[in-house]
Amino acid sequence: MHKVFASDFFNFEFLRLLGTVPFQGAEVGECLTTAGRIKDGDPESWYRAWRDQAEKAQALAEEAAAVGDKTGACWAYIRAANYWRASEFLLHCTPKDPRILASSKASVNAFDKGWVLLDATVKNFEIPYEKDIKLPGRLYLPAPHHRLPGKIPVVLQTGGFDSTQEELYFYGAAGALPRGYAVFSFDGPGQGLPLRVGKLKLRTDWEYVVSQVLDFVTDDVAPEYDLDLERLAIFGASLGGYLSLRAAVDPRIKACVSCDGPLDLFEITRSRMPPWFINGWLSGWVSDGVFNWVVDGLTAVNFQIAWEFGHGKWVFGVETPADVLRVMQKISLKGGYLEKIKCPTLITGAADSFYFTPDINANIIFEGLTALEPNDKHLWIGKGVEGGGLQAKIGALAVVHHKMFTWLDSTFAIKRDVL
Protein backbone atom coordinates (compact mmCIF):
# COMPACT_ATOMS: atom_id res chain seq x y z
CA MET A 1 0.00 0.00 0.00
CA HIS A 2 1.29 3.45 -0.93
CA LYS A 3 1.76 5.72 2.09
CA VAL A 4 1.30 9.48 2.13
CA PHE A 5 2.84 9.76 5.61
CA ALA A 6 5.67 7.61 6.96
CA SER A 7 3.95 7.50 10.34
CA ASP A 8 1.37 4.70 10.42
CA PHE A 9 -0.82 6.77 12.73
CA PHE A 10 -0.85 9.91 10.59
CA ASN A 11 -1.24 7.85 7.43
CA PHE A 12 -4.23 5.99 8.89
CA GLU A 13 -5.97 9.21 9.91
CA PHE A 14 -5.29 10.67 6.47
CA LEU A 15 -6.84 7.61 4.81
CA ARG A 16 -9.78 7.95 7.20
CA LEU A 17 -10.53 11.26 5.51
CA LEU A 18 -9.61 10.24 1.98
CA GLY A 19 -11.85 7.18 2.23
CA THR A 20 -14.94 9.37 2.48
CA VAL A 21 -14.44 10.84 -1.00
CA PRO A 22 -17.14 8.62 -2.60
CA PHE A 23 -19.69 10.08 -0.19
CA GLN A 24 -18.70 13.77 -0.43
CA GLY A 25 -16.71 13.73 2.81
CA ALA A 26 -13.56 14.93 1.09
CA GLU A 27 -12.09 15.91 -2.28
CA VAL A 28 -8.94 14.15 -3.49
CA GLY A 29 -7.20 17.35 -4.56
CA GLU A 30 -8.05 19.11 -1.31
CA CYS A 31 -6.68 16.18 0.70
CA LEU A 32 -3.44 15.92 -1.24
CA THR A 33 -2.84 19.66 -1.02
CA THR A 34 -3.56 19.63 2.70
CA ALA A 35 -1.24 16.66 3.25
CA GLY A 36 1.57 18.67 1.70
CA ARG A 37 1.15 21.27 4.45
CA ILE A 38 1.42 18.76 7.30
CA LYS A 39 4.66 17.83 9.02
CA ASP A 40 4.54 14.11 9.78
CA GLY A 41 4.12 13.55 13.51
CA ASP A 42 3.27 17.20 14.25
CA PRO A 43 -0.32 17.62 15.53
CA GLU A 44 -0.15 21.42 15.33
CA SER A 45 0.56 21.39 11.61
CA TRP A 46 -2.23 18.82 11.21
CA TYR A 47 -4.67 21.12 12.98
CA ARG A 48 -3.72 24.21 11.00
CA ALA A 49 -3.82 22.46 7.63
CA TRP A 50 -7.27 20.90 8.10
CA ARG A 51 -8.67 24.05 9.73
CA ASP A 52 -7.61 26.06 6.70
CA GLN A 53 -9.12 23.51 4.34
CA ALA A 54 -12.35 23.44 6.35
CA GLU A 55 -12.64 27.20 6.01
CA LYS A 56 -12.07 26.97 2.26
CA ALA A 57 -14.71 24.26 1.85
CA GLN A 58 -17.15 26.26 3.96
CA ALA A 59 -16.55 29.31 1.78
CA LEU A 60 -17.28 27.23 -1.33
CA ALA A 61 -20.50 26.00 0.28
CA GLU A 62 -21.65 29.54 1.02
CA GLU A 63 -20.71 30.62 -2.50
CA ALA A 64 -22.81 27.78 -3.94
CA ALA A 65 -25.73 28.54 -1.63
CA ALA A 66 -25.70 32.18 -2.70
CA VAL A 67 -26.37 31.22 -6.33
CA GLY A 68 -28.86 28.46 -5.57
CA ASP A 69 -26.52 25.55 -6.29
CA LYS A 70 -28.11 23.11 -3.84
CA THR A 71 -25.87 20.17 -4.72
CA GLY A 72 -22.65 22.16 -4.60
CA ALA A 73 -23.57 23.70 -1.26
CA CYS A 74 -24.57 20.34 0.22
CA TRP A 75 -21.36 18.61 -0.81
CA ALA A 76 -19.09 21.44 0.32
CA TYR A 77 -20.80 21.81 3.70
CA ILE A 78 -20.40 18.08 4.34
CA ARG A 79 -16.72 18.24 3.34
CA ALA A 80 -16.21 21.21 5.63
CA ALA A 81 -17.80 19.30 8.50
CA ASN A 82 -15.41 16.40 7.98
CA TYR A 83 -12.36 18.66 7.73
CA TRP A 84 -13.37 20.48 10.91
CA ARG A 85 -13.71 17.11 12.65
CA ALA A 86 -10.26 16.07 11.48
CA SER A 87 -8.64 19.36 12.48
CA GLU A 88 -9.19 18.90 16.22
CA PHE A 89 -8.67 15.13 16.27
CA LEU A 90 -4.97 15.11 17.12
CA LEU A 91 -5.30 17.76 19.84
CA HIS A 92 -6.86 15.30 22.30
CA CYS A 93 -3.70 15.00 24.40
CA THR A 94 -4.82 18.31 25.92
CA PRO A 95 -8.64 18.13 26.18
CA LYS A 96 -8.91 21.64 27.62
CA ASP A 97 -7.55 23.14 24.40
CA PRO A 98 -10.38 25.52 23.34
CA ARG A 99 -9.77 24.70 19.68
CA ILE A 100 -11.27 21.23 20.23
CA LEU A 101 -14.71 22.50 21.16
CA ALA A 102 -14.61 25.34 18.62
CA SER A 103 -13.77 22.96 15.76
CA SER A 104 -16.31 20.38 16.96
CA LYS A 105 -19.08 22.95 17.01
CA ALA A 106 -18.02 24.19 13.57
CA SER A 107 -18.22 20.60 12.30
CA VAL A 108 -21.74 20.11 13.66
CA ASN A 109 -22.84 23.49 12.31
CA ALA A 110 -21.51 22.78 8.82
CA PHE A 111 -23.05 19.32 8.77
CA ASP A 112 -26.42 20.69 9.88
CA LYS A 113 -26.30 23.12 6.96
CA GLY A 114 -25.39 20.31 4.60
CA TRP A 115 -27.93 17.67 5.53
CA VAL A 116 -30.92 19.95 4.91
CA LEU A 117 -29.83 19.90 1.26
CA LEU A 118 -29.50 16.11 1.00
CA ASP A 119 -31.80 14.02 -1.19
CA ALA A 120 -33.38 12.66 1.98
CA THR A 121 -35.30 13.73 5.07
CA VAL A 122 -33.13 14.31 8.14
CA LYS A 123 -34.31 15.17 11.64
CA ASN A 124 -32.33 16.14 14.72
CA PHE A 125 -33.50 14.90 18.12
CA GLU A 126 -32.63 15.22 21.79
CA ILE A 127 -32.77 11.78 23.42
CA PRO A 128 -33.68 11.63 27.13
CA TYR A 129 -30.79 9.95 28.93
CA GLU A 130 -30.52 10.58 32.67
CA LYS A 131 -32.29 13.24 34.75
CA ASP A 132 -32.15 16.38 32.61
CA ILE A 133 -29.33 15.09 30.37
CA LYS A 134 -30.09 14.57 26.69
CA LEU A 135 -28.05 12.95 23.93
CA PRO A 136 -28.01 14.24 20.33
CA GLY A 137 -29.61 11.93 17.78
CA ARG A 138 -30.21 12.18 14.07
CA LEU A 139 -32.71 10.31 11.91
CA TYR A 140 -32.06 9.84 8.19
CA LEU A 141 -35.05 8.81 6.08
CA PRO A 142 -34.74 7.66 2.45
CA ALA A 143 -36.28 9.82 -0.25
CA PRO A 144 -39.63 8.54 -1.59
CA HIS A 145 -38.03 7.19 -4.77
CA HIS A 146 -35.69 5.04 -2.65
CA ARG A 147 -38.38 3.67 -0.33
CA LEU A 148 -38.86 -0.07 -0.04
CA PRO A 149 -42.38 -1.55 0.18
CA GLY A 150 -43.93 -1.41 3.63
CA LYS A 151 -42.46 0.15 6.72
CA ILE A 152 -38.87 1.41 6.62
CA PRO A 153 -36.11 -0.91 7.90
CA VAL A 154 -33.80 0.99 10.22
CA VAL A 155 -30.19 0.81 11.36
CA LEU A 156 -29.34 2.13 14.81
CA GLN A 157 -25.77 3.41 14.52
CA THR A 158 -23.42 3.79 17.47
CA GLY A 159 -20.04 5.51 17.45
CA GLY A 160 -16.89 4.25 19.11
CA PHE A 161 -13.75 5.43 20.88
CA ASP A 162 -13.09 8.58 18.84
CA SER A 163 -15.84 9.10 16.25
CA THR A 164 -18.50 11.80 16.08
CA GLN A 165 -22.05 11.52 14.87
CA GLU A 166 -21.21 13.63 11.83
CA GLU A 167 -18.50 11.18 10.74
CA LEU A 168 -20.90 8.26 11.24
CA TYR A 169 -22.87 9.53 8.24
CA PHE A 170 -20.24 8.18 5.84
CA TYR A 171 -20.31 4.73 7.45
CA GLY A 172 -24.07 4.36 7.70
CA ALA A 173 -26.54 6.75 6.13
CA ALA A 174 -24.49 7.37 2.97
CA GLY A 175 -24.91 3.70 2.06
CA ALA A 176 -28.29 3.10 3.69
CA LEU A 177 -30.40 5.87 2.16
CA PRO A 178 -30.11 4.89 -1.52
CA ARG A 179 -30.89 1.29 -0.50
CA GLY A 180 -34.11 2.28 1.24
CA TYR A 181 -32.95 1.98 4.84
CA ALA A 182 -33.37 4.61 7.54
CA VAL A 183 -30.55 5.29 9.99
CA PHE A 184 -30.80 6.62 13.53
CA SER A 185 -27.38 7.73 14.77
CA PHE A 186 -26.45 9.21 18.11
CA ASP A 187 -23.54 10.45 20.19
CA GLY A 188 -23.45 8.75 23.57
CA PRO A 189 -21.43 9.53 26.70
CA GLY A 190 -17.75 9.80 25.87
CA GLN A 191 -18.48 10.77 22.26
CA GLY A 192 -19.01 13.93 20.23
CA LEU A 193 -20.64 16.87 21.98
CA PRO A 194 -21.76 14.88 25.05
CA LEU A 195 -18.04 14.51 25.83
CA ARG A 196 -16.94 17.96 24.70
CA VAL A 197 -19.82 19.99 26.15
CA GLY A 198 -21.53 17.76 28.70
CA LYS A 199 -18.31 16.18 30.01
CA LEU A 200 -20.03 12.77 29.94
CA LYS A 201 -17.60 9.87 30.12
CA LEU A 202 -17.83 6.62 28.18
CA ARG A 203 -19.69 3.80 29.89
CA THR A 204 -18.44 0.24 29.60
CA ASP A 205 -22.02 -1.08 30.01
CA TRP A 206 -23.09 0.38 26.67
CA GLU A 207 -26.21 -1.76 26.66
CA TYR A 208 -27.62 0.70 29.20
CA VAL A 209 -27.00 3.65 26.88
CA VAL A 210 -28.58 1.90 23.91
CA SER A 211 -31.59 0.89 26.00
CA GLN A 212 -32.32 4.59 26.59
CA VAL A 213 -31.94 5.31 22.88
CA LEU A 214 -34.18 2.37 21.96
CA ASP A 215 -36.87 3.56 24.36
CA PHE A 216 -36.93 6.88 22.53
CA VAL A 217 -36.81 5.36 19.05
CA THR A 218 -39.52 2.80 19.68
CA ASP A 219 -41.87 5.07 21.62
CA ASP A 220 -41.42 8.46 19.94
CA VAL A 221 -39.67 8.15 16.58
CA ALA A 222 -40.83 4.91 14.97
CA PRO A 223 -44.60 5.58 15.10
CA GLU A 224 -44.27 9.04 13.55
CA TYR A 225 -41.83 8.08 10.79
CA ASP A 226 -43.13 4.61 9.88
CA LEU A 227 -40.03 2.72 10.98
CA ASP A 228 -40.17 -1.07 10.97
CA LEU A 229 -39.20 -2.20 14.47
CA GLU A 230 -39.18 -5.82 13.31
CA ARG A 231 -36.33 -4.89 10.97
CA LEU A 232 -34.15 -2.88 13.34
CA ALA A 233 -30.40 -3.53 13.25
CA ILE A 234 -27.51 -2.05 15.21
CA PHE A 235 -24.18 -1.20 13.61
CA GLY A 236 -20.86 0.01 15.00
CA ALA A 237 -17.24 0.03 13.83
CA SER A 238 -13.98 -0.47 15.75
CA LEU A 239 -14.77 0.10 19.44
CA GLY A 240 -18.29 0.74 18.16
CA GLY A 241 -18.24 -2.88 17.00
CA TYR A 242 -17.73 -3.92 20.62
CA LEU A 243 -20.42 -1.49 21.79
CA SER A 244 -22.90 -2.84 19.23
CA LEU A 245 -22.37 -6.37 20.57
CA ARG A 246 -22.94 -5.15 24.13
CA ALA A 247 -26.25 -3.70 22.96
CA ALA A 248 -27.29 -6.70 20.87
CA VAL A 249 -28.57 -8.55 23.94
CA ASP A 250 -31.61 -6.25 23.88
CA PRO A 251 -34.48 -8.23 22.28
CA ARG A 252 -35.65 -5.12 20.43
CA ILE A 253 -32.56 -5.40 18.23
CA LYS A 254 -33.26 -7.85 15.43
CA ALA A 255 -29.79 -7.94 13.82
CA CYS A 256 -26.27 -6.80 14.70
CA VAL A 257 -23.35 -5.74 12.50
CA SER A 258 -20.12 -5.57 14.49
CA CYS A 259 -17.38 -4.12 12.29
CA ASP A 260 -13.80 -4.86 13.41
CA GLY A 261 -14.50 -4.67 17.13
CA PRO A 262 -12.28 -5.93 19.98
CA LEU A 263 -12.92 -8.97 22.14
CA ASP A 264 -11.04 -7.58 25.13
CA LEU A 265 -9.50 -4.10 24.96
CA PHE A 266 -7.13 -4.61 27.86
CA GLU A 267 -5.68 -7.82 26.42
CA ILE A 268 -5.00 -6.04 23.12
CA THR A 269 -3.22 -3.19 24.91
CA ARG A 270 -1.37 -5.70 27.06
CA SER A 271 -0.07 -7.51 23.97
CA ARG A 272 1.67 -4.29 22.86
CA MET A 273 3.69 -4.01 26.08
CA PRO A 274 6.74 -5.99 27.31
CA PRO A 275 5.36 -8.97 29.29
CA TRP A 276 7.62 -8.34 32.29
CA PHE A 277 6.39 -4.75 32.53
CA ILE A 278 2.64 -5.26 32.23
CA ASN A 279 2.67 -8.46 34.28
CA GLY A 280 4.72 -6.68 36.92
CA TRP A 281 2.08 -3.96 37.10
CA LEU A 282 -0.75 -6.49 37.29
CA SER A 283 0.97 -8.32 40.14
CA GLY A 284 1.76 -5.10 42.01
CA TRP A 285 5.51 -5.49 41.61
CA VAL A 286 5.49 -2.40 39.35
CA SER A 287 3.67 0.40 41.15
CA ASP A 288 1.25 2.82 39.52
CA GLY A 289 3.85 5.52 39.98
CA VAL A 290 6.50 3.61 38.06
CA PHE A 291 4.01 2.51 35.40
CA ASN A 292 2.82 6.07 34.84
CA TRP A 293 6.39 7.39 34.77
CA VAL A 294 7.38 4.89 32.06
CA VAL A 295 4.30 5.55 29.93
CA ASP A 296 4.69 9.31 30.29
CA GLY A 297 8.29 8.93 29.13
CA LEU A 298 7.15 7.00 26.06
CA THR A 299 4.55 9.63 25.23
CA ALA A 300 7.32 12.21 25.04
CA VAL A 301 8.91 10.39 22.10
CA ASN A 302 5.96 8.59 20.48
CA PHE A 303 2.98 10.71 19.49
CA GLN A 304 0.69 7.76 18.80
CA ILE A 305 1.13 6.51 22.37
CA ALA A 306 0.67 10.06 23.66
CA TRP A 307 -2.59 10.44 21.74
CA GLU A 308 -3.96 7.02 22.70
CA PHE A 309 -3.41 7.55 26.42
CA GLY A 310 -4.36 11.24 26.26
CA HIS A 311 -7.61 10.50 24.48
CA GLY A 312 -8.22 7.53 26.76
CA LYS A 313 -7.88 9.64 29.90
CA TRP A 314 -10.31 12.18 28.47
CA VAL A 315 -12.94 9.69 27.27
CA PHE A 316 -12.78 7.52 30.39
CA GLY A 317 -12.61 10.45 32.79
CA VAL A 318 -9.42 9.36 34.56
CA GLU A 319 -6.11 11.05 35.35
CA THR A 320 -3.33 8.50 34.77
CA PRO A 321 -2.24 5.83 32.26
CA ALA A 322 -2.69 3.16 34.95
CA ASP A 323 -6.30 4.22 35.39
CA VAL A 324 -6.84 4.04 31.63
CA LEU A 325 -5.86 0.38 31.74
CA ARG A 326 -8.17 -0.25 34.67
CA VAL A 327 -11.11 1.00 32.62
CA MET A 328 -9.95 -1.09 29.67
CA GLN A 329 -10.12 -4.18 31.87
CA LYS A 330 -13.89 -3.66 31.95
CA ILE A 331 -14.18 -3.50 28.15
CA SER A 332 -14.48 -7.20 27.45
CA LEU A 333 -16.88 -9.68 25.88
CA LYS A 334 -15.36 -12.59 27.76
CA GLY A 335 -17.09 -14.43 30.58
CA GLY A 336 -20.08 -15.65 28.60
CA TYR A 337 -21.44 -12.30 27.38
CA LEU A 338 -21.49 -13.38 23.72
CA GLU A 339 -23.69 -16.34 24.62
CA LYS A 340 -26.47 -13.88 25.51
CA ILE A 341 -26.76 -12.58 21.93
CA LYS A 342 -29.78 -14.12 20.21
CA CYS A 343 -30.19 -11.96 17.09
CA PRO A 344 -28.55 -12.70 13.70
CA THR A 345 -25.06 -11.20 13.73
CA LEU A 346 -22.46 -10.21 11.14
CA ILE A 347 -18.91 -10.07 12.51
CA THR A 348 -16.17 -8.44 10.44
CA GLY A 349 -12.43 -8.36 10.94
CA ALA A 350 -9.54 -6.49 9.33
CA ALA A 351 -6.58 -8.62 8.28
CA ASP A 352 -4.22 -5.63 8.08
CA SER A 353 -5.33 -3.82 11.24
CA PHE A 354 -2.63 -2.55 13.58
CA TYR A 355 -5.18 -2.51 16.40
CA PHE A 356 -7.67 -5.41 16.46
CA THR A 357 -6.28 -8.34 14.46
CA PRO A 358 -8.82 -11.05 13.55
CA ASP A 359 -6.99 -13.96 15.20
CA ILE A 360 -7.57 -12.63 18.71
CA ASN A 361 -10.76 -10.66 18.02
CA ALA A 362 -13.19 -11.32 15.15
CA ASN A 363 -12.51 -15.05 14.91
CA ILE A 364 -12.96 -15.62 18.64
CA ILE A 365 -16.02 -13.36 18.81
CA PHE A 366 -17.62 -15.32 15.98
CA GLU A 367 -16.97 -18.65 17.70
CA GLY A 368 -18.36 -17.24 20.94
CA LEU A 369 -21.83 -16.66 19.47
CA THR A 370 -22.92 -20.09 20.65
CA ALA A 371 -26.62 -19.25 21.00
CA LEU A 372 -26.90 -18.65 17.24
CA GLU A 373 -27.53 -21.24 14.56
CA PRO A 374 -24.86 -21.40 11.81
CA ASN A 375 -27.14 -19.58 9.36
CA ASP A 376 -27.68 -16.74 11.83
CA LYS A 377 -24.06 -15.70 12.14
CA HIS A 378 -21.60 -14.68 9.45
CA LEU A 379 -17.89 -13.81 9.50
CA TRP A 380 -16.16 -11.61 6.94
CA ILE A 381 -12.44 -10.82 7.18
CA GLY A 382 -11.41 -7.93 4.92
CA LYS A 383 -7.99 -8.18 3.29
CA GLY A 384 -5.93 -5.38 1.75
CA VAL A 385 -6.76 -1.70 1.92
CA GLU A 386 -9.06 -2.07 -1.09
CA GLY A 387 -10.94 -4.99 0.46
CA GLY A 388 -11.63 -3.75 3.97
CA GLY A 389 -8.37 -4.91 5.51
CA LEU A 390 -7.70 -1.72 7.51
CA GLN A 391 -9.29 -1.04 10.89
CA ALA A 392 -12.96 0.00 10.63
CA LYS A 393 -12.74 -0.61 6.87
CA ILE A 394 -10.96 2.71 6.33
CA GLY A 395 -10.51 3.24 2.59
CA ALA A 396 -13.21 0.71 1.67
CA LEU A 397 -16.49 2.19 2.87
CA ALA A 398 -18.33 1.30 -0.34
CA VAL A 399 -17.23 -2.31 0.17
CA VAL A 400 -18.50 -2.47 3.74
CA HIS A 401 -21.80 -0.88 2.65
CA HIS A 402 -22.18 -3.60 0.03
CA LYS A 403 -21.33 -6.42 2.44
CA MET A 404 -23.47 -5.06 5.27
CA PHE A 405 -26.61 -4.27 3.33
CA THR A 406 -26.45 -7.47 1.29
CA TRP A 407 -26.39 -9.36 4.59
CA LEU A 408 -29.16 -7.22 6.11
CA ASP A 409 -31.31 -7.67 3.00
CA SER A 410 -30.97 -11.43 3.40
CA THR A 411 -31.60 -11.31 7.15
CA PHE A 412 -34.68 -9.09 6.80
CA ALA A 413 -36.00 -10.93 3.70
CA ILE A 414 -35.69 -7.85 1.49
CA LYS A 415 -35.88 -8.83 -2.18
CA ARG A 416 -34.42 -6.72 -4.97
CA ASP A 417 -34.65 -7.15 -8.72
CA VAL A 418 -31.57 -8.46 -10.49
CA LEU A 419 -30.10 -5.71 -12.68
Swiss-Prot record:
Pfam families: FrsA-like (PF06500)
Keyword Hydrolase appears in the UniProt entry: yes
Keyword Coiled coil: no
InterPro entries per the UniProt record, alphabetical: AB_hydrolase_fold, FrsA-like, FrsA_esterase
Pathway per the UniProt entry: Mycotoxin biosynthesis
E.C. numbers: 3.7.1.-
Phenotype of gene-disrupted mutants: Accumulates 20-hydroxy-prefusarin.
Active site: S238
The protein's role, per its UniProt record: 20-hydroxy-prefusarin hydrolase; part of the gene cluster that mediates the biosynthesis of the mycotoxin fusarin C. Within the cluster, FUS1, FUS2, FUS8 and FUS9 are sufficient for fusarin production. The roles of the other FUS members are yet undetermined. The fusarin C synthetase FUS1 is responsible for the condensation of one acetyl-coenzyme A (CoA) unit with six malonyl-CoA units and the amide linkage of the arising heptaketide and homoserine, subsequently releasing the first intermediate, prefusarin, as an alcohol with an open ring structure.
Protein family per UniProt: Belongs to the AB hydrolase superfamily. FUS2 hydrolase family.
Name of the protein in question: 20-hydroxy-prefusarin hydrolase FUS2
